[in-house]
Amino acid sequence: YWDTGDMTWEVEDNKYVIDEVWENYGSKYKSFGGWYISGEISRATKGAIGAFHALGKQCKDISNGLPTFISPWIDGKKAIMGTTKMTREDAVSVQQHEKEWDEIFDGIHDVVDACAFQDGHIDYDELDAFFSVNKKLADKYGMQCWTNAESFDRDMPIRFLPIKFDKLRLKLEAAKRAG
């Protein structure tokens, strides 16, 4: 996926991992309580809906319906991996994020129970707007909405120092306001 931008191969690789994890852990330990589908995407990535649906369905089928969740990242102005820039101009708008994730949730909500958006790629003054949209969409599709409060600082030229607690508090308070 990282090289091609196409999620379809993720299904082929991960179906064996799901089987192995269930055989070695899920079927043996009561503490195995659900699944994290680890394909971290941001937007309307080619094949993402089909890949997440196939992986979520396989996880649920093999485990008799245990919960599944995903943790995508928001394609904000701090999504600058592989560059020397601190921010970028072509970040996703709240409206475009809502449109794209409405389509994605529509295609996966029957096999993905929860979504925990990573918050590290958006600015602090954008937290409320994005978190509100995320919660609204999750509610629309009967999914749980969590937050993935990233604890490293993207506002520094050195990548990635631990975040100051005041910044973490801003993230947690924004998540609380969103519900």
PLM region spans:
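Glycan-processing catalytic domains of CAZymes
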Residues: 1-179
